[in-house]
Structure formats: C-alpha cells, structure tokens
C-alpha cells in the first residue's frame, strides 16, 4: 500500500470516527430526554453547605420563617469537604446570631499573638505589627476549624426549619421556559466516563425553586455553567487562583502557643513567584500549617507540593514540628482575583454566593 492509499485510509477512519461519536451523542441525548425524574418544589434551593450557603439559608429563614428552603451538600456530612483551618472574623456571625456565645458556637481560641515574617533560607525577619495594614490585624478574631463552624451553622439552620440533604451531588441545571434557572438535578448515579448510562443508573430527582443559590466553592461546575450562560464575567478581569495546602499537626506542648497566628512570605518561593504560608495554633496542642502558591508561576518545573515540603524544613518551622505528628492533610483551590475579577452575582432565577462568586477578601486573608 502506497503513502497515498494510507492517507486516504487514515482520513476515512477519522471521518468514520467522527460520525460514530455524533451518532453516540444523539443516542445519549435521546436516552437522557426519555428519563423521567421525580420533582420537589421549594422556595429556595441552595447548592453547597459551606459558610456562605448555610448563612444565606439562616438569614432567609430569619426574615421569613414560612419559606421552604433546602440546602444540598455533596459531602457525606456537612463539613466533610471544608478544608480550612481559619482565622475567623466574627463580625458576620454577630449579624446572624448576636448571642453566638450563648449558642456555644465553636469559636473558643481567640487570637493572642499576631506575627508576620519575611523568610530567608536560613533565617527570618519579623515585620513590626505597626507597619502592617490595619486589614491584616487579627485582634478580636478566632482560630477555628471551619468544618466545625459549618456543622454548627447546619444545626442552627435545621433548628429554624431548613432542610439539609448531605450526600447529594448536583450534576445538572434545570432551566425554565424563559431561560431562567429553575433548579438542579441531584442524587444522579451510574453514569460512565463518556456520559453513557450504566445498568446501575439512578436518575436522581429535580429540586426546583423560585430562586436557586449556588455556593459550590471555587470553580464549581454548575457555577461555571451559569457564569458562561448569562455572561456574568463580561467586563471583568480574568480570575486568578492559588493552590492552598494544609496539614494539621499535633506538636510538643512545649512548642505549642495557643492563639498564635503567623503568616510569612519569601523563601522558598522567593519574590518571583507569589504566595505565602500560615501557621495557626489551635487548642489541644494542634497546629494548622499551610502554604498557598499562586497559580500564575512561570517556572514549569515548580511544584507547589514540593515548595510546601521545603517550607516545613525552614529552621523556624522545623523546630515547631520536631517530634510532632501529622494527623490530617489536604489541598484546595483558592480564589485570589480580587474585586476586579468578581462576576455579576445575580442572574435570572438565582445568585452566586461565597467562593463561587470569588468573594474572598484578600487583604484580610478571609
């Protein structure tokens, strides 16, 4: 067979492959159009039981106790997908529950010491607090487990009559006749990687609402669809993201300083790549150790994970962790675009909440 024949055969095969994919797509579309799902109607459907979604549900119930509100959480329980040992400014919580202390909110470790360092490979320079912007002052804040805070918020929401369904991943959006968002498909199982339906397929159900709030967190799959469909990012800067890695350590009691908050920049990233670290001393000899690397680095060989490992070998950090035990770890994307990257949050039938809308106050690191 000559080269000309090979090219013809290759082109024929590619053409057949395209037609097969088109046919498969048509068959899949037909299958999906024939699926019948049960529906449940609410006044408000909220996707995501993070702090934004739960706070929205609570505030709506406080304003009108007759509203039917459901919160859908993909994790096995509320807080299962929350990855943030955080310093919490309680001002937002005060607006929801002025009596949060009497309600035993899990804010038990006030910030007692606030440090900021510029690191070199073998040493560090502490920046005086007086030189730091007021927004970075953590006086009056608390070191918390956001997972515990979300579980507590869920308890308060349920006490007000909010329905919370855990283990309910939302896979699809439901639109109304006028193009408005009407609801979501939740609890769908048994789709293969190419979208085809397996024998174990469960269609899930449609949860419909007069309003649908998306609080999925950073780069949520449904939020991205809504931003594109309604052109919510028109006129905005391109959003920026970082990769945040966090570990929980149990350290030697002699090295533990409950209430201490430390942030740093510099080594190992240097100043050509942006990012930095945090170390928060919780109670029970536990310490949150984390590192954030902005994902705009130009060096293709840079590994955020390895930069985090190098950071832990800095003399100051290694001394803290010596003899300690890592008890949990994880990583998560972080929105870092700033106000100029915020999309419009309202759209026909709903709104974006929290990190789905990029609502992170970077100067506050909150």
Model-derived features with residue positions:
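Short, positively charged and aromatic/hydrophobic N-terminal segments
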Residues: 16, 21-27
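A short, basic/flexible loop-to-alpha-helix module at the beginning of a structural domain
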Residues: 26-41, 195-204
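N-terminal Rossmann-like FAD-binding beta1-loop-alpha1 element of flavoenzymes
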Residues: 44-70
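Conserved Rossmann-like nucleotide-cofactor binding loop
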Residues: 52, 77, 219
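N-terminal FAD cofactor-binding segment of flavoenzymes
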Residues: 74-123
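Short beta-strand to alpha-helix junction loop
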Residues: 136-155, 165, 298-303
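Predominantly flavin-linked oxidoreductase catalytic cores and closely associated redox partners
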Residues: 156-316
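FAD/FMN-dependent oxidoreductases across multiple families
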Residues: 273, 299, 304-366
């Amino acid at each position: 067979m000559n080269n000309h024949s090979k090219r013809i055969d290759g082109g024929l095969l590619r053409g057949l492959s395209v037609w097969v994919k088109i046919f498969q797509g048509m068959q899949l579309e037909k299958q999906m159009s024939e699926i019948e799902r049960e529906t449940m109607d609410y006044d408000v459907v909220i996707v995501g039981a993070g702090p934004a979604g739960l706070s929205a549900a609570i505030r709506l119930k406080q304003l009108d106790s007759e509203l039917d509100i459901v919160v859908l959480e993909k994790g096995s329980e509320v807080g299962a997908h929350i990855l943030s040992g955080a310093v919490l400014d309680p001002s937002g919580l005060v607006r929801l529950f002025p009596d949060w202390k009497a309600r035993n909110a899990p804010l038990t470790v006030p910030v007692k010491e606030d440090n900021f360092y510029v690191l070199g490979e073998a040493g560090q320079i502490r920046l005086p607090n007086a030189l730091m912007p007021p927004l970075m002052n953590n006086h009056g804040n608390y070191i918390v487990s956001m997972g515990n805070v979300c579980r507590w918020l869920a308890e308060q929401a349920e006490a007000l009559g909010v329905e919370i369904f855990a283990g309910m991943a939302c896979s699809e959006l439901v639109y109304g006749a006028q193009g408005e968002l009407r609801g979501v498909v939740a609890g769908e199982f048994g789709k293969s990687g190419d979208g085809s339906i397996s024998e174990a397929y469960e269609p899930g159900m449609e949860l419909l609402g007069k309003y649908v709030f998306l609080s999925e967190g950073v780069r949520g799959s449904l939020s991205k669809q809504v931003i594109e469909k309604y052109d919510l990012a028109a006129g905005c800067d391109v959003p920026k993201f970082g990769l945040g890695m966090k570990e929980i350590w149990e350290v030697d009691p002699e090295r533990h300083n409950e209430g201490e908050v430390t942030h740093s920049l510099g080594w190992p990233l240097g100043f050509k790549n942006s990012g930095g670290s945090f170390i928060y001393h919780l109670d029970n000899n536990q310490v949150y150790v984390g590192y954030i690397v902005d994902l705009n680095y130009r060096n293709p060989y840079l590994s955020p994970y390895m930069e985090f490992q190098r950071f832990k070998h800095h003399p100051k950090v290694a001394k803290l962790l010596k003899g300690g035990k890592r008890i949990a770890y994880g990583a998560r994307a972080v929105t870092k675009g700033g106000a100029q990257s915020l999309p419009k949050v309202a759209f026909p039938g709903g709104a974006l909440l929290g990190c789905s809308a990029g609502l992170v106050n970077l100067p506050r690191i909150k």
